[in-house]
C-alpha cells in the first residue's frame, strides 16, 4: 500500500490492498477467498489476478507496508530521543499509534504472520521481529546502565511483557470507542514505567 500521503490519490491497486486488509482482519486469511475480495470490490476474480498472483501476495504486501512504516516511525524516534526513557516512551506510544491508525494491518500481523512463517516470502517478518526485539532490549539495557531503570531488571522478560501489552491490545481495542489508542497506551505505559523505573530514593540509596 502507498505511504501516508493524503495529497496523492490511492491507486486502484492500493484500494484493493486496503479492502483485502480489512477483510483479512475481519474474517481471517483462511476464510477470505479471492472471490470474496473481488465481489466486495465489484470486479471479477480474474481482474483481481491481474494485480496480484494470490491472496498470499496481498498479505505479503500488507505486512511489508506495515513493518516498513512501523520501523520508519521507530527510527524517527530513536534519531531524536535523548534518553532511554524517552526512547521507550516513544516506541511504546508509536505501537499504539499503529493500533489506532493501521488497525487492520496490526490484526493481520498478530493473527496471520506466524501461520505464514513457513513460506519463504514471509522470512522478512521474522527478520523484523528480531530487529524489534534487539531495539527494545538495547533500550532497556541502556536504561539499566544509566540508572533510569531498576538494576535487577530482567530485560528479556520486560521486553516480552511490553510486546504483549502493546500488540495483543489490538484483539480487543476498536477504533472509535470511548478511549483512543493513545489514551489506552498512556495508561499501559504508566503501569510499565511504574514497574521498571527507579525512584529518586532508590537511585541515591
Swiss-Prot record:
Domain HTH tetR-type positions: 10-70
A single GO molecular function term of this UniProt record: transcription cis-regulatory region binding
DNA-binding region: 33-52
Keywords, ordered alphabetically: DNA-binding, Repressor, Transcription, Transcription regulation
Keyword Transcription regulation attributed: yes
Any GO BP: regulation of DNA-templated transcription
UniProt cross-references to InterPro entries, sorted A to Z: Homeodomain-like_sf, HTH-type_TetR-like_transc_reg, HTH_TetR, KstR2_TetR_C, Tet_transcr_reg_TetR-rel_C_sf
Pfam families xref list: TetR_C_24, TetR_N
Top-level taxonomic group: Bacteria
Quaternary structure, from the entry: Homodimer.
Function: Controls the expression of a small regulon that may play a role in the utilization of cholesterol.
Protein name stated in the entry: HTH-type transcriptional repressor KstR2
Amino acid at each position: 500500500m502507498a505511504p501516508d500521503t493524503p495529497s496523492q490519490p490511492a491507486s486502484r491497486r492500493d484500494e484493493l490492498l486496503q479492502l483485502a486488509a480489512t477483510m483479512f482482519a475481519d474474517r481471517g486469511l483462511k476464510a477470505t477467498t479471492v472471490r470474496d475480495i473481488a465481489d466486495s470490490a465489484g470486479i471479477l476474480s480474474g481482474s483481481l489476478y491481474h494485480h496480484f498472483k494470490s491472496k498470499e501476495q496481498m498479505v505479503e504486501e500488507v505486512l511489508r507496508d506495515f513493518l516498513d512504516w512501523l520501523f520508519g516511525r521507530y527510527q524517527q524516534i530513536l534519531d531524536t530521543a535523548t534518553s532511554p526513557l524517552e526512547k521507550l516512551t516513544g516506541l511504546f506510544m508509536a505501537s499504539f499509534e499503529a493500533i489506532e491508525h493501521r488497525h487492520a494491518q496490526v490484526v493481520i500481523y498478530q493473527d496471520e504472520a506466524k501461520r505464514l512463517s513457513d513460506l519463504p516470502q514471509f522470512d522478512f517478518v521474522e527478520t523484523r521481529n528480531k530487529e524489534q526485539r534487539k531495539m527494545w532490549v538495547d533500550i532497556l539495557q541502556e536504561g539499566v546502565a544509566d540508572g533510569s531503570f531498576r538494576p535487577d531488571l530482567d530485560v528479556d522478560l520486560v521486553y516480552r511483557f511490553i510486546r504483549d501489552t502493546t500488540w495483543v491490545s489490538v484483539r480487543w481495542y476498536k477504533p472509535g470507542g470511548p478511549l483512543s489508542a493513545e489514551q489506552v497506551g498512556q495508561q499501559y505505559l504508566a503501569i510499565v514505567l511504574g514497574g521498571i523505573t527507579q525512584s529518586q530514593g532508590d537511585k541515591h540509596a
